[in-house]
Each structure stands twice: as structure tokens, then as C-alpha cells.
């Protein structure tokens, strides 16, 4: 574990709530980039920004075809970077996708994508994590409520909240097929979870979150205070959200599959140290140790 002062304690004997110690926007309001000043203000207030169409239909078709190629490739399935759904035994996620696929690497470098990350974080950025997510119809399980930063801080060693994620839809996101839910404004309070981090926790948590999960009481208070926003939209839409937003998604029991590309950008001025609340680092395909800026 790290010896750096821990601004956001977690995984102790009791659940704790700490006001955010970091800015939400690290750039100045007039920082050039694709996000308008009004949208930056909205992002700072709510913790997220929805973009109705980030990429066009032809691009959606390209990325969706690449996703399908990867999840049906036996070599990819056998790779430790692929996570399999426990019940159906179908691929749920493929990590480090920007290193596996040049097509997705190009998406990461696209100025519409990385430019927004630089604008929000106020610096050059690198990819802390990338993956494709697949939620087939008829029973694909969801992700329980959590803050990504809680995990990235506790288990990967990210010191500060200077990280932003983008989820780019490759299928239609209906209000019924297990879409992303966020508690608006929850990013301004850090919820430190109770309980020590088990050894090799990542192997279990990538299929079903346990350690780092808030209590029912805390979630009820946050939901009463902030409400819950469900994100819908056409293929090609995108949602940017702060690393500390409480978010989750439900099971997909509809016939309509849902898939997306998920990219996590971290500031080059916030590189990972040793974990704050775990005995060892998670593997690099989950939490990068290559801090090379995206160019």
C-alpha cells in the first residue's frame, strides 16, 4: 500500500462520507475544446454530460463490427482480458481494447473523444482503462451501484479525482435494456466503503461487485438527495461522467442487446501510485501503469 496522505479513506471498519477535496473541472472555463462553456458548467454541477451523437452511423457500424469480431475470436475469449458472464458463459467485457484493436485505438485518439477529456481534466491524458461491454438480451446481469474512483483509488492507487470516463453506445439504449443510471451531483461527496479488500478481488468484482459497494442506507440517502437519471439514446450517443459519480445499471431481460465502448482517461498529473486500500495492484490491463499521453 502507498504511504501518501489518503484524502479519501475507504475499505476500513466503517463506511465514511467525505466532501470532495478536488475540483470537478481542472481546466479554465475558456479552455479550448469541443465542450461549450454551458455544457462544462452543467458537467461541473451534475457530474456528467450526455452527447446525443458523438459518432455517425458509418462509424457505429465499423466499431460494432469490430466488437463482434473480437467477442467471437477464440484467442480473445481465451485471453485474461476477457470477462465471461457467469451464467450464460458469454463474453461480458474485453479490457485493454485500445491495445488489442487498432480500430478502437483510433477511436481513443479521435479529437472528439480525447479532446473532451483534456478539456475537463485540464492537462494531457492517458488511458487508465478501456473496454468493450456487451449486454445480450434475456438475462445479462447489471452492475450494482458504485463509484469508480473508490475502486481506482483503493485498488489502483489513483491519488485524486482527476479522471473522466466516456461510454459510447454501439446499440440503441432504451429505458428497458439495462442502461446506465447516475445519481446527479453524487460526485461531490466521496463514500468510503466498509470492509477490507480481499486478495485478487478484481477476479470476482469484474463479474459481480462486492468489495467497494455502498450500504443500502447510504444509497437511499444519496438517491433521496440527488435522484437518479437513466440514460437513453441512439447508437453513436455518448455519456461523459466524473470518476466519483455513483452509478450502476440493471439486468437486461429484454430481447434488445446493449453494447458500448468504455474509455477512462486520467490526467498525466494524477498518475497511479501504490494502492491506498489493497495489498497489491490490480493487473495493468485493468489499471494502466503506462502513463504515455494520448496523441
Curated annotation (Swiss-Prot):
Free-text comment on the cofactor: Binds 1 Fe(2+) ion.
The protein, known as: Ectoine dioxygenase
Family named by the database record: Belongs to the PhyH family. EctD subfamily.
Annotated Fe cation binding sites: 146, 148, 247
The gene coding this protein: ectD
Binding partners and assembly: Homodimer.
Assigned EC number: 1.14.11.55
Keywords: Dioxygenase, Iron, Metal-binding, Oxidoreductase
Annotated organism of origin: Streptomyces avermitilis (strain ATCC 31267 / DSM 46492 / JCM 5070 / NBRC 14893 / NCIMB 12804 / NRRL 8165 / MA-4680)
Lineage, broadest ranks: Bacteria, Bacillati, Actinomycetota, Actinomycetes, Kitasatosporales
